[in-house]
Amino acid sequence: MWIKNGYRLAKKKKNNNYLFSKERNEKFDVIKNEFYKNKLLTDYLNIKGYKSFQSGKWWLGSWEEGKFDGGMTHGDFARQGRHGDEGLKIGREGLNPIFDFIDQTQEDGDPFFVWYAPFLPHTPHDPPQELLDKYIKLAPSEPVAKYWAMCEWFDKTVGDLMNYLKEKSLDENTLIIY
């Protein structure tokens, strides 16, 4: 392994599947096991009756391991799970899993916690065309324009979530940490 400019560069394997290999999974388990020796935010929230939902980036295995009540990330390297796998669709493909979770907690009368950590603005940089058009003439290059558009897309999804909370009259009694 080499460190260059703050990035870890793993030696390439012949089949280039190291990221999803059993070997990497076993090494990563050591890190996860150390992390999970500690109490988690979800532990404290569960004690107070909160229901919690994970979406987006989650580098520590599955949502179940994080003691969430629901979620999107399976975290299984053998199934190409990495950094959030299914959870990475959140934001890019809408917010319906989060909205459904919030609706269910309200139906059940439970307080809720949502982990919303979309992979926006990470690659692939494929913003909606209207956002790209906004930045293409302002940016020094197309890749920079795409990145800026992705950042705005991320902000837009946060706004969509906040608007949803307002529509449900939950905005006055909800803490948002951004």
Question: Can you annotate each of these PLM segments?
Answer:
Residues 1-178:
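Formylglycine-dependent sulfatase
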